[in-house]
Amino acid sequence: MTERQVECVLIEIPQGSRNKYEYDKERKVIRFDRMLFSSIVYPCDYGFFPDTLALDGDPLDAMVLMWEPTFPGCVIDVHPVAMLDMEDDKGRDEKILCVPQRDPLWNYIKTIEQVPPHLLKEITHFFETYKNLERKDVVVYGWRDLETARKVIQEAKDRYTEQKKLSNQ
């Protein structure tokens, strides 16, 4: 088996929150963006991989399975395990599912097959419905395996590096 990949995730939104926080690149702070219009809460900690660029122009999204929620601005070393393939009004919007490297309640999980099936359904349902009352369309295509997640992470890192090179010219 290949060695487990360790990545860094910056948390914007803790599990159980209806508040949508976003990282403000210019000010280098976490800002309150809005409260979700629906009476549902984030099913896991949510943030992004620093120094990445996803297809939607933002850093690549990450979800981290935690026993207890963390806080906006918390940095966690994680192992990717899968990817939720979806699209929103800005286009493709992949989200990488991760487990904390140093949490014995979750870090045994290496692949999507080890994630509790009902939890995957809850996460899918959240992303299918969380923008309904805003009248924004979201399409969830389904879960993808670890290899797909790794590929998308590497592509987002490469895209970020390329953009940084171009902006320095």
Swiss-Prot record:
Mg(2+) 1 binds at residues 56, 61, 93. GO terms for molecular function: inorganic diphosphate phosphatase activity; magnesium ion binding. It is found in: Cytoplasm. GO terms for cellular component: cytoplasm. Its cofactor is Mg(2+). It is an enzyme of class 3 (hydrolase). The keyword Magnesium applies. Substrate binds at residues 20, 34, 46, 130. GO terms for biological process: phosphate-containing compound metabolic process. Pfam families: Pyrophosphatase. The keyword Metal-binding applies. Mg(2+) 2 binds at residue 61. InterPro entries: Pyrophosphatase, Pyrophosphatase_sf. Keywords: Cytoplasm, Hydrolase, Magnesium, Metal-binding. It catalyses: diphosphate + H2O = 2 phosphate + H(+). Its EC number is 3.6.1.1. Catalyzes the hydrolysis of inorganic pyrophosphate (PPi) forming two phosphate ions. Belongs to the PPase family. Homohexamer. This is Inorganic pyrophosphatase.
